[in-house]
Swiss-Prot record:
The lineage of its organism: Eukaryota, Metazoa, Chordata, Craniata, Vertebrata. Residues 264-273 have a biased composition (Basic residues). Residues 154-256 have a biased composition (Basic and acidic residues). This is Protein B4. It comes from Xenopus laevis. Residues 189-217 are annotated as: 3 X 10 AA tandem repeats. GO terms for molecular function: DNA binding. Keywords: Chromosome, Developmental protein, DNA-binding, Nucleus, Repeat.
Length: 273
């Protein structure tokens, strides 16, 4: 038998088959979700600090003791990774000042013994100093320059409002000027009165002096009389004999009185001459 001829497929059917084949070749892209492992333990440095707080020894704690205590407290930590994590944590603690080596320790790196550093008390003054150190001096200068400008603007704006105050100030100045004038006039009057009183006192003194001089002038005349009396002294000395005569007369009277009878007064009293 002769071979059968291939039957030509319809054109529409070929297109559908081609579309099915193309769809099978398309790859479906699935989103790859990455699973993030959440750490069930705190960071290594905080774990080291916890261990050192519990074990406060003077000589400090060794690295091996720290590692064993971390594993006992946090069993989820991978012991293989903990070696490398401890080294980095200890170095960071030394750099930040959280950890300290004991005295007389010659160890270096993440070996030897470690202790916790004493917490430094930050005072208010220290905080203020830190704040002042962080501030830029240039910024302060700019703020100081800007502040006077604002003040000048405020003054210029307030000048029209201050006209009343200026008028009041002028009146006060005028009053203050008048008061000194009044005071000066009073002082001048007092000075004039004092001068008048001084002049009057001087005039009175002059009058008193003149009166004294007048009193002294006639007093000199009696001196002349005394001189005349002295000159006449010789004449009086010559007239002494009449005085003796007067004495003789008195003696005679006394003798006559003794010889005369005594007169009797009233009531038997004797009357004496």
């Amino acid at each position: 038998m002769a071979p059968k001829k291939a039957v030509a497929a319809p054109e529409g059917g070929n297109k559908e088959n081609a579309a099915v084949k193309g769809s099978s070749k398309v790859k479906v892209k699935r989103k790859s979700i990455k699973l993030v492992k959440t750490q069930s333990h705190p960071p290594t440095l905080s774990m080291v600090v916890e261990v050192l707080k519990k074990n406060t020894e003077r000589k400090g704690t060794s690295v091996q003791a720290i590692r064993t205590r971390i594993l006992s407290a946090h069993p989820t930590v991978d012991p293989l990774r903990l070696k490398f994590l401890l080294r980095t944590a200890l170095n960071k603690g030394l750099e930040k000042g959280i950890l300290i080596r004991p005295l007389n320790s010659s160890a270096t790196g993440a070996t030897g013994r470690f202790k916790l550093a004493k917490p430094v008390k930050t005072t208010k003054a220290g905080k203020e100093n830190v704040a002042s150190e962080n501030v830029d001096p240039n910024a302060e200068q700019e703020t100081q320059k800007k502040a006077p400008k604002k003040e000048k603007k405020a003054k210029t704006e307030k000048e029209p409002k201050g006209e009343k105050t200026k008028a009041v100030a002028k009146k006060a100045k005028e009053d203050s000027d008048e008061k000194p004038k009044v005071a000066k006039s009073k002082k001048d009057k007092e000075a004039k009165e004092v001068d008048k009183a001084n002049k009057e006192a001087k005039e009175v003194d002059k009058a008193n002096k003149e009166a004294k001089e007048v009193d002294k002038a006639p007093a000199k005349k009696p001196k002349a009389k005394t001189e005349a009396a002295k000159a006449e002294g010789g004449g009086k000395a010559k007239k002494e004999p009449p005085k003796a005569k007067a004495k003789d007369v008195k003696a005679q009277k006394d003798s006559t009185d003794e010889g005369a009878p005594v007169k009797a007064g009233k009531k038997g009293k004797k009357v004496t001459n």
